Each structure stands twice: as structure tokens, then as C-alpha cells.
């Protein structure tokens, strides 16, 4: 399959094979390189070839891979839990809190000390759209910080700050919430304040680093929205399957069509 015939919006072939249960991602790369994979009748040996598992016929050793139905699961990741599928150090992973054995993966990450909405799916095109900075999908957070930011500090966050190791300004659409505002009954202690923050790109520890640059330490950080998907009334450690309307709205916001999901 030549590069000009690839769909740039598709998924990498080795990832599709791994999600279909053929083998591990590394082993799938070896299978591709050995010439054992055909896409629409053509042998593919180039790693990174992009395919559409919904429309392309993919075969390994002459056998078509089984198409896995798309799955979408929302989890309230608690603090102290890492946003990975496996951890070599034996720490609790977000994946271990998901009540299914299906192969679904987290979309992006939340810091270990952060909490809130984490989406799991096997919908590769959706995950790619939600994570890639150029698509500018909104993610909303509530942050409890030490101190009360000035209007000048809030304006600086909205305009963007150049942080160490960054080459361009990072922005955060930040609003100071009323002193009486609370997150599920938890009001800001004296000398602290809750903020509402919206990001349209994601860099490591972006919110914590930006607020630290304005002189404020983050005590608590909660993600409550990813695009059109809301955390809702989930409690820490709880999860749920997305409704068809939630799934379709999320895909539509990412510029994708609807898909028939298993749940």
C-alpha cells in the first residue's frame, strides 16, 4: 500500500492488529515486517501504514482479523492512581478500575495527583482527534489553589506564558469562581480559591506549571469535561459506559461520523 493511498485519518496498522488481539504491538510490527499482512489484497511491510479497520480488509496469514466493536467508557480516576494500562512498579492503574476485559485504552492522561474524567475506548480515530493539539478540543478542570489570583494573573494565563523547556506560550482560559462556590460540598479554605480552567492543548503538568508561574500552588485538580463528555455524578473510582447520544455527540464534535457500538 503506497503512501498516497493511505488515509491520513486512519490508525497505524500495528495498533489495529494489536487491538484485534493478534499479538502485542511489538510482535505485530515483526509480523508486518515479515510480509504476513495484507490490506485489501496487497502485502504491507511498511510500519506505520495507516488503515481504516471499518472499511479496509486486513488479513494475517490469509485470515481476516475480527473487527472489534467500538467501546466507550468514562471513569472518575481517583488521586494516587496512574493513567496507564500496566505499571511495572505494581502501582494501581486506572485500567484496573474499568469493569471489562475488553481491549480499551485511556485517551490521554491525568497526572497521578489529579483526578476526574478519563475516557477509555478502542476507537482509534476518536482518540487521535481528542489528543492531537491541532484539533483544539476543550478539556475543563476545576483547580483549588493556594492564594487568590489577581486579574492581572488571570489575564496572563489567558494570553499565555512561556514556561521553561517550552518554545511558545501555553494558555489556560481561567476564571476565578465565587468564594462560596464548592465542589460537591468542598469549599475553598480561607486564603484559597477554586478556579475553572479550560485547555485546548495538553502539555505535561500544564495547569500546575502555569499556576506555579503566577505564584500559586495547586492543592486539588479535577477534570470534569472532555469535549462534550461530562464527568456527571460519578464518584472517584466509579465508571460507566457512554450512552449512544454521548458517544455520537463526542464523535461529532471531533468531526467524525456515528458508529454502532457494542454498549
Features from the language model and the residues they span:
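Basic, flexible Lys/Arg- and Gly-enriched helix-loop patches that mediate nucleic-acid binding at interfaces
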Residues: 2-263
Amino acid at each position: 500500500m503506497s503512501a498516497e493511498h493511505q488515509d491520513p485519518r486512519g490508525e497505524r496498522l500495528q495498533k489495529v492488529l494489536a487491538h484485534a488481539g493478534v499479538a502485542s504491538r511489538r510482535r505485530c510490527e515483526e509480523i508486518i515486517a515479515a510480509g504476513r499482512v495484507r490490506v485489501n489484497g496487497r502485502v504491507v511491510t511498511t510500519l506505520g501504514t495507516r488503515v481504516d479497520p471499518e472499511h479496509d480488509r486486513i488479513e494475517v496469514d490469509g485470515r481476516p482479523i475480527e473487527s472489534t466493536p467500538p467501546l466507550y467508557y468514562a471513569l472518575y480516576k481517583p488521586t494516587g492512581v496512574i493513567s496507564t494500562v500496566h505499571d511495572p512498579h505494581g502501582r494501581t492503574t486506572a485500567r484496573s478500575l474499568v469493569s471489562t476485559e475488553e481491549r480499551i485504552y485511556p485517551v490521554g492522561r491525568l497526572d497521578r495527583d489529579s483526578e476526574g474524567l478519563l475516557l477509555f475506548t478502542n476507537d482509534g480515530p476518536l482518540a487521535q482527534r481528542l489528543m492531537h493539539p491541532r484539533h483544539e478540543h476543550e478539556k475543563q478542570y476545576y483547580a483549588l489553589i493556594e492564594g487568590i489570583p489577581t486579574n492581572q494573573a488571570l489575564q496572563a494565563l489567558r494570553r499565555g506564558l512561556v514556561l521553561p523547556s517550552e518554545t511558545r506560550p501555553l494558555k489556560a482560559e481561567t476564571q476565578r469562581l465565587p468564594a462560596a462556590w464548592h465542589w460537591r460540598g468542598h469549599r475553598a479554605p480561607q486564603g484559597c480559591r477554586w478556579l475553572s480552567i479550560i485547555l485546548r492543548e495538553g502539555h505535561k503538568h500544564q495547569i500546575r506549571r502555569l499556576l506555579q508561574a503566577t505564584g500559586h500552588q495547586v492543592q486539588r485538580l479535577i477534570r470534569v469535561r472532555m469535549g462534550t463528555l461530562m464527568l456527571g455524578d460519578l464518584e472517584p473510582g466509579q465508571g460507566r459506559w457512554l450512552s449512544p447520544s454521548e458517544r455520537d455527540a463526542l464523535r461529532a464534535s471531533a468531526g467524525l461520523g456515528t458508529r454502532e457500538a457494542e454498549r
